[in-house]
Every structure is written in C-alpha cells, then in structure tokens.
Amino acid sequence: MRPLYLLPIVAAVVSCTTAPQAPQDARPKVTAIDLEQVTAVLKRDFHERGQAKMNRVELDDVQRLCNLHADNPPADVAKRIEEAQMNTIRFPEGSLIGNWKAGEKIAQSGRGSMWNDKPSDAGGSCYNCHQIGPHETSHGTLGPSLLGFGKKRGNGPEMQKYAYGKVYNSQAFSACSSMPRFGHNKVLTEQQIKDVVALLMDPESPVNK
C-alpha cells in the first residue's frame, strides 16, 4: 500500500498556527520543515501492526514535491516528476490484457492492505473514483467515467500500453495525480493490472457495453 499522504495533516497543523487565516478554500503554505515535523510525529505515534509497516509514513520524492507545491507544481517540476515516474514502470513481456471478469472483481473490491487483513491480493477500489459499468448504483466522481473506454479509444497495443502504465503509475502521466500508483507501490500485481486493462479494453467487458 502506498505511504500516507501527509498534506491534509500538514495543512491542518499550519492553518492553526498561521495568522491571519488563509481563505477557506486555499491551502496553507507547506515547508520542508513542516513535512519533517509531521513525519516525526507520525513515526512517534504510529506503531507497526500486522502488515501495516512504518514505511507507510515515509514520503518519497514525488510525495514530498507534491506536498510542497500543494499538488500543483510548476511546469518544470511537473515534467521532472513525470519523467522520473515513467522510468519506474515495468511493462511485462507479451500481452498486456488479462481477464476482464477478474478485472471487474478487482475494480469493485476495496479490501486489502489493512493491518487486520491477511496478506493477499488487494482490490483496486476503482469504483470509488470512477464509473465502471452502466448499471452501477453508486460510484465516485473524483476521476472521469470509464464507460466506453475501449470503444472510444480502441484496444490496440499502444492503448494497452497506455492503460497498463496509467494503472501502474499514474503520476508518470499527470504529476501529483490523486490516482494511486498501484504497480509502483505494489498494491496490485502484474497479473491484476493486466486484468484491469482487460476490463477497460475487452469488447465484452461491461465498460464497453
């Protein structure tokens, strides 16, 4: 599971100590010292339990930059982030498409990676942010609807590679994206990512019906 994003906590701490108060919809400025202090507090107060290890409170370079720039870095920083993250993507040999039925189960599942879960393959919780099928009774809207993804964009090799890479590490395509870096942070396995790609691409998938 990816390490925790600390910006909401940092923002709350800074907003309580900054005068005058920033507008309600504005993020208080976060500094490197703020990040160090909050990380120190989390390391002090959080404890390893089950599969939830302390590395989850560590920020990597991307998270640090995104926090410092309130998820809206300058163009040169964004380009640097995307290039670095693109280099982390590991494409498997052969086909990038798995089983769409398995992919749908992954997309609908939010289980896994909690301290009290048994270590096993996790779900992707894709429905929390995206519409996946036409008959879903509820879905999130943080991300775009995925209805008709393969029908609209095609399912050729280049689009398969794009979809695999996007699921593997979304920040290779959009710096500071809210989408989890499923492959980079080992939330989903290689086969699971292939299955999600199949969900997006297969003509028989509910995404494309």
Q: What are the residue ranges of the model-derived segments?
A:
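Acidic (Asp/Glu) carboxylate-rich active-site/surface patches
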Residues: P8
